[in-house]
Amino acid sequence: MSALKRVIWPQIILFGDSITQFAFQANGWGSELCHKLERKCDVINRGLSGYNTRWAKIVLPRIVPVSDAPISAVTVFFGANDCALEDKNPTQHVPLQEFSENLKDIVRFLVSKGVSNDNIIFITPPPLLEADWEKECLLKGSPLNRLNSVAGQYAQACVQAAGESGVDVLDLWTLMQKDGQDFSVYLSDGLHLSDKGNQFVAEHLWTLLERRVSDLPFILPYWGDVDPKCPESSLLCD
């Protein structure tokens, strides 16, 4: 009997901080992507809570490639920690210009590993609800260490870096505040996403991802198409 051809699932890699790490929780935006891409693609979570782009750039070569499977898309979702105020949270803070260069370096590395620019999507940090996040900080014995206006500067830098790198971008900071809407419904603690926030990200990200994955086939035959008398003829064919 000839060697069996291994079935390879294409991959979508989610690379980011805690907002990505938590994306596979119930009602998370990553979980929604998994649901949409069942039997077509593996959605791989590489979210690292608390990380900034400085640390992300260092560990990226240890994360990508995951395997020899083709990569259909990579999301790069940082900025919520980079934008921490330097005088209040120097550990996570990354200066604005360095943040921008780190994002571009991440793209260069991914491209060097065979990921096309067209398959990379930046996601900006969401807006920050300062009153709610201050409560979280005070519970930990710290003063407010982020500002929405500063998060906006990092979001703008992310959008600009995306343009300079030739990659797509989902500008959450702008979209969640569009037309003066109450963005508090999108946040659970002033920084991280609520169920509605996760739904918002999933819906808007899917509009960018859909064309990149629309041609992915259903992997392995539908059960009703398997020949019950000789299943091998259905299941072992290329």
UniProtKB/Swiss-Prot annotation:
The enzyme's main class, written as a single word, is hydrolase
In its UniProt record, which GO terms are filed under biological process?
lipid catabolic process
**Gene3D superfamilies cross-referenced by the UniProt entry:** SGNH hydrolase (3.40.50.1110)
Which InterPro entries does its entry note? GDSL, Iah1-like, SGNH_hydro_sf
The active site of this protein is located at: S18 (nucleophile), D189 (proton donor), H192 (proton acceptor)
User: Which terms does the record give in the GO molecular function aspect?
Assistant: hydrolase activity, acting on ester bonds
Q: Does the keyword Lipid metabolism apply?
A: yes
**E.C. designation(s):** 3.1.-.-
Residues the UniProt record annotates as site (Transition state stabilizer):
G50, N81
Query: What is the role of the protein in this entry?
Result: Probable lipase.
What protein family is recorded? Belongs to the 'GDSL' lipolytic enzyme family. IAH1 subfamily.
Protein's UniProt name:
Isoamyl acetate-hydrolyzing esterase 1 homolog
Q: Name the source organism.
A: Danio rerio
